[in-house]
């Protein structure tokens, strides 16, 4: 009799299980969507020392990246200097819409350090992305964002 009851109500049991599973998935997706990506901020003319690790953002190329927010104004001319004795550094400046404004792999001094110059055309929050070139996992680095003074001549 129990078997007959289970089979006769099987569609109701299946519908209830599906509804519960769907509600559970919706709850999980709402929790995941509520997390906002907000990297730490860096101010111009202040040098920071940090460490790129395997706990940072995977690049998909075997390396890792770390982001910093920086507020820039229209007309700013910035230099972004990234140095490391532990890895071949790359630096990127990324606009609020996710587009790459500028990037640099190796600086003009012939080392694997990075030096990027850019003129800002739109005020807003930008991301400075520090990453290791290739499959290097990372290490210690120094990062500095400098607002350059316009030439008065």
Show the residue positions of the predicted features.
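Noncatalytic accessory or regulatory domains flanking protease catalytic cores in secreted, cell-surface
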Residues: 3-4, 89-144, 148
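Non-catalytic extracellular/lumenal accessory regions of secreted precursors
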Residues: 2-4, 24, 28-69, 74-76, ...
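Short solvent-exposed loop/turn micro-motifs enriched in small/polar/acidic residues
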Residues: 62-63, 84-86, 111
